[in-house]
Amino acid sequence: AYAAARGADRMSSYGDWVALSDTCDVHTAKLLQREVSDGIIAPDYTEEALEVLKTKRRGTYNIVKIDPNYVPAPIEHKDVFGVTFEQGRNELKIDEAMLMQNIVTENKELTEEAKRDLLIALITLKYTQSNSVCYAKGGQAIGVGAGQQSRIHCTRLAGNKADIWFLRQHPKVLNLPFVDNIRRPDRDNTIDVYISDDYEDVLADGVWEQFFKTKPEPLTREEKKEWLATFSGVSLGSDAFFPFGDNIERAKRSGVQLSLIHISEP
């Protein structure tokens, strides 16, 4: 689960906090060991996991244990410049039943994969700053657009991230001849530039030698378009309604299967 969540956006290269809903085992700790991270919070840790995590950041890695039985207050309070705001805590229950409440298209069937991905998208949105849109596929979030002033900007931002997620799986990208011992953040950042229109920034003479053993061929715009045209089976969630059809049109370009109603709102 951690690997899938991390893979949603590899450009979080220089620090994050990891939140786990279950005990951190040694396998998760070893995955985390090689990533740049500022801390982890979880209900418990195995002894083996603790030994691994204690080696991060020369022993200064933040490891926080939470009470899994803690129940927060139903009313939240926030103070802003001396003014106190109160609001009910978001206790929305996201489950399969809510997906089946109001299917408006002729096709009323959702595959098990679609249900899983829609639930993942909606759970992600529950804890994401509004306005927000999430694309999901294969049991993981692949693009999140958050905190935008308009819904279409959320859809575009999340769609662009989903496209990048898929482009990272292009055969040319998977076979890039990186130099030995390249740092993981450098590799991720190099891939991000390579698949963009600014690929010359990493392929120019005198530059590519820093990252590659041999100079790769660029991933052309035509190749990217052809690859993205095969992108399908994506689910999409939104934390509010779509006011205009432009959101639907943009989502479709990133593989959202509208015929299966892969769009949901909590």
State the predicted function of each range.
Residues A1-L258, S264:
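ATP-dependent carboxylate/acyl-activation modules
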